Curated annotation (Swiss-Prot):
InterPro entries: MADS-box/MEF2_TF, MEF2-like_N, TF_Kbox, TF_MADSbox, TF_MADSbox_sf. Residues 197-245 are annotated as: Disordered. The keyword Transcription regulation applies. Residues 213-224 have a biased composition (Polar residues). Its main location: nucleus. This is MADS-box transcription factor 55. GO terms for molecular function: DNA-binding transcription factor activity, RNA polymerase II-specific; protein dimerization activity; RNA polymerase II cis-regulatory region sequence-specific DNA binding. The gene is MADS55. One of its GO terms (biological process) is regulation of transcription by RNA polymerase II. The lineage of its organism: Eukaryota, Viridiplantae, Streptophyta, Embryophyta, Tracheophyta. It comes from Oryza sativa subsp. japonica (Rice). Residues 1-61 form the MADS-box domain. Residues 109-199 form the K-box domain. Expressed in roots, shoots and developing panicles. Expressed in shoots. Transcription factor that acts as a negative regulator of brassinosteroid signaling.
Amino acid sequence: MARERREIRRIESAAARQVTFSKRRRGLFKKAEELAVLCDADVALVVFSSTGKLSQFASSNMNEIIDKYTTHSKNLGKTDKQPSIDLNFFLIILLRTYTNSYAYIHLLLQLEHSKCSSLNEQLAEASLQLRQMRGEELEGLSVEELQQMEKNLEAGLQRVLCTKDQQFMQEISELQRKGIQLAEENMRLRDQMPQVPTAGLAVPDTENVLTEDGQSSESVMTALNSGSSQDNDDGSDISLKLGLP
């Protein structure tokens, strides 16, 4: 029994049309990929949906295949002088124009949006790991994950302590170097200062200063004190004598 041939016509329902387009597009790209692999052929497909969305497939590089087609068409034009070559070249230019049009830009925006979503997921995961390193949101972790986190924290602590010790040693070395420089500067300034005599004039002892006649000041003061005491004694005798009848 012969298979009934199905009539090909435009699908009226937009939803059904979109579903059919997606299925047929995947099948078309699959056949193109099989052709490229089985026959070692360069295959390029460009499809625009009714909404202007671009879909393309290339077994190698799309631009390289288009350039190859352009070169081949020009060579055929030189040999056969076919008038359709100019039309083919115009179609290639038009295809590249569409490739750089809004549909292609929309595709690039979709790719960038996908990359942005991936980066946001990575950022959220890194933020969660950072909070867990601070001891937050540990409820969902298993024992093995907690042990691994403990090892990571211990390794990080060892690196921090090692770095701190290295910085301490560098600061100590810097202080020692500055101390040596100050000592050298002190010696240089001391060498530049004039020599001051250390033996000065002797300070006289006031208690043992000699007078002009060779007597010391102590002996002179003793003599004066004794003389004054004798004068006081004489005066007292005179006053006593005058007072008697």
